[in-house]
């Protein structure tokens, strides 16, 4: 099974979105993410975390495992981040010579 790095992109940084959200919006957002991770099940290798820095368009990451990038994209249907941005799916390759 291959591993895939997901990069969560949006026009506004994760820190800016969180700073502008009410506590209720933050709780609802976390509930949606928790529900998605539960649905993805054993495909989730690392739930990831928010990120900061760079050009601000990457707000976080996760690592999933699946048979193919298409299988990952299928898992991403209904992902809460797609309401505010896009998700890059990058296969993590073994180091050269490994």
What are these regions (language model features)?
Residues 1-98:
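Conserved, structured core segments of small domains
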């Amino acid at each position: 099974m291959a591993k895939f790095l997901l990069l969560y992109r949006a026009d506004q940084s994760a820190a800016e979105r969180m700073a502008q959200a009410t506590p209720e919006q933050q709780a609802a957002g976390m509930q949606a993410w928790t529900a998605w991770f539960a649905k993805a099940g054993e495909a989730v290798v690392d739930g990831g975390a928010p990120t900061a820095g760079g050009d601000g368009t990457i707000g976080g990451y996760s690592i999933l495992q699946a048979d193919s990038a298409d299988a990952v994209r299928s898992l991403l249907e209904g992902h809460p981040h797609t309401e505010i941005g896009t998700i890059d799916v990058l296969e993590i390759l073994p180091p050269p010579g490994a």
